[in-house]
Amino acid sequence: MFANEVIGFINDSPTPFHAVSNIKKILDDNGFVEVYEGGREEIRFGEKYYVTRNGSAIIAFVMPEGIPSSMSIVASHCDSPCFKLKPEPVICVEKNYLLLDTEKYGGLINSTWLDRPLSLAGRVFMDYGNKIVPKLVDFKDVRLVIPNLAIHMNPEINKGYQYNLQKELLPLLGMGNDRDSFDKLLKSACGAGKILGMDMFLYNSEPGTVAGIDNELILSPRLDDLECVYASVDALINSDNKDKLCMCCVFDNEEVGSKSLQGADSDFLLMTVKKIAAGLNMDEQTFSGMLSRSMVVSADNAHALHPGYTEKADTNNRPVINEGIVIKKNSSLKYTTDGFSEAFFKKICKNAGIPVQMFANRSDIAGGSTLGNISISHMSVHTVDICLLYTSPSPRDRG
């Protein structure tokens, strides 16, 4: 079942670094060849390639058998809301409790992170002589927890409570007062060498699962947006298009605005397309013509109609889980879909026998944005924002 494939990928991808590493393995197993930014590798017709940036963003593409007439691009993101460790993270409380100093990453529902098993994963940079070497770590067998206060000490909690990020949402690492315990934990995974830097995140260590009376739902961490990531990679691998340049883009840092080296608000996509064009000796007219006939599908998630909060959905544009793929529109261009890209995508879905639903926010609720309108600010291409459905950005999404 495809849902179990998605869940397996998500379980193995606790951070963007792990997600990109796993994508590389999938692509390698399916005949893709890695090329490098700034490299002079030959780009050949009919071949399959990928390029990464900073270990947390990746673009894979399948070359047509001749000069491409257009591009079909799917863009998604591999980061999710969570907590990130600060430098020098160990805090000792009353000489008995070891906490980790964290800050929130992205838009969290804070209370959903309490009283559940959490783990640590990320990327560590090691000093190996004249080289700085990155190493992925995942302490999946180490359990941390952000403990709630007993209701007897906070009897008003069920009437609404605002948690203090600096004081009440720090994970408990363990008991005692050994401030070096965290460094020892890192070194146990990294081996010899001095640790120079790190990007470490808390994640929900409970594995994803299917749910519902007919297994029609997925309960999993990081559904936003790893389900779209996996689906787009799988679609690219199984593409048999001979005329278009087919491309899958996975960006990082969407949850915090995409303004990074590896985010959608960077030149990663544009520079990759230019690298391909240069490898094919495209002139400017051919290149601009290819762009004008291309389409970007921004594949992120949207809010399904919530059975407990039906009033939070738009009057008419209120999609339901498992009733078809969703096209998102917004007059303020938080989503990039316009009439043309809507019609174009609906035609594709009709030809494939796929039902379509429309999503729009209530007029009095701003809603979120996604990466489509950001990525096309660097490369002007028709874009449609589509999505699968989920119900909340929490450590255990539903979709």
List the predicted regions and their residue ranges:
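Soluble metallo-hydrolase cores and metallopeptidase-like ectodomains found primarily
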Residues: 19, 54-60, 65-68, 137-220, ...
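Conserved small/polar residues in nucleotide/adenosyl-binding loops
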Residues: 390-399
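A glycine-rich helix N-cap at a beta->alpha junction
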Residues: 269-289
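Alpha-helical metal-binding/catalytic segments enriched in His/Glu/Asp
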Residues: 219-257
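N-terminal capping segment at the start of a domain
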Residues: 1-17
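Acidic/His- and Gly-rich active-site-bordering loop/insert found
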Residues: 34, 39-85
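A generic, well-ordered mixed alpha/beta core segment in the N-terminal half of proteins
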Residues: 70-155
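Active-site-adjacent substrate-binding region
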Residues: 15, 181-195, 302-389
